[in-house]
Amino acid sequence: MNGIVNVLKPPGMSSHDVVDRIRRIFGVKKAGHTGTLDPGAAGVLVVCLGVATRLARFLLGEDKEYRVEITFGMSTSTGDSYGEITDQRDASFLKEHDIIRVLPEFTGEVRQVPPMTSAIKWRGKKLYELAREGLVVERQERAVYIKSLEFIRGSGWGTPSPRALMHLSCSKGTYVRSLCHDMGSRLGCGAHMSFLVRTRAGPFKIADSVTLEELQAAASKGVLERKIIEMDRAVSEYPEVIVKSSAVKAVAAGSKLYIPGVARMPLDLDCGKLVRLTGPDGLLAIAEAGREPFDKEKLFFKPVCVLARQAGRSSN
């Protein structure tokens, strides 16, 4: 089986465990997700099956959306509710307008220090592996982009640990727990991420996601294929270049596609632009537009991720 599954990851499972479960349900060897969710978090986990795993690197860069609950007045060792409390302060002074007032400071380009619980490597070891050993190392700030951060509602006003529910839209690589920690520091009371749900990853929305139980039930009924999303839909944001039947074999071999082999394409494609090459059997490849150095008028598309071989077999 080849394609994409939009899984609703439950809290309490690691992303790795979810992928293992998917492998067993679908009976495939190759499967991988396109962006980790913490074990305590829930929501959209995009899993690629079979040849679709080649598309994972193109989906990793997609923007994401979350619902996040922030608890003020308590900082933890991990930045979420699973760590030990490292600092506790009375945040009963906080009001809704205090939080709304600082939100513009956390939108646009924001500098973040990756948490020790992240998978970033430091001298060959992942940070979370070092954290398990009780080590803390210096990390460099990274720039991320927060498209929007909206206050939805709050609770516990006037208590030592009020909470706020937010909607977050952000770029890849954004550490939500770091955002919560930094907001708590800005407000002078500390904070941690107490709940997180990913509501969207690129084109995949939580409203369209399926649970592991639903997938297992579909497998029992023999209708598991209905839960698979076609590869072409996963990369539909890329401009489409339709390939003539006579040029499909060359694309499958990874050769450059020139205009004579194109049936239809958008106008004004710039060099370096990624496109999707499609043929009679669906998605053939992801390719990069370019021009020959000796003939700037000669446009071509160089495959950077070929899927055509599998597409050809599946059509028989």
From Swiss-Prot:
This protein's UniProt keywords? Isomerase, tRNA processing
Domain PUA, residue spans: 238-312
Q: Which Pfam families match?
A: TruB_C_2, TruB_N
UniProt cross-references to CDD domains, sorted A to Z: PseudoU_synth_EcTruB (cd02573), PUA (cd07953)
Catalytic activity reads: uridine(55) in tRNA = pseudouridine(55) in tRNA
**Enzyme active site:** D38 (nucleophile)
Q: Which GO terms describe its molecular function?
A: RNA binding; tRNA pseudouridine(55) synthase activity
HAMAP family, from UniProt?
TruB_bact
Q: Which PANTHER family match?
A: PSEUDOURIDYLATE SYNTHASE TRUB1, TRNA-PSEUDOURIDINE SYNTHASE
Q: Which family does it belong to?
A: Belongs to the pseudouridine synthase TruB family. Type 1 subfamily.
Q: What is this protein called?
A: tRNA pseudouridine synthase B
Name its species. Pelotomaculum thermopropionicum (strain DSM 13744 / JCM 10971 / SI)
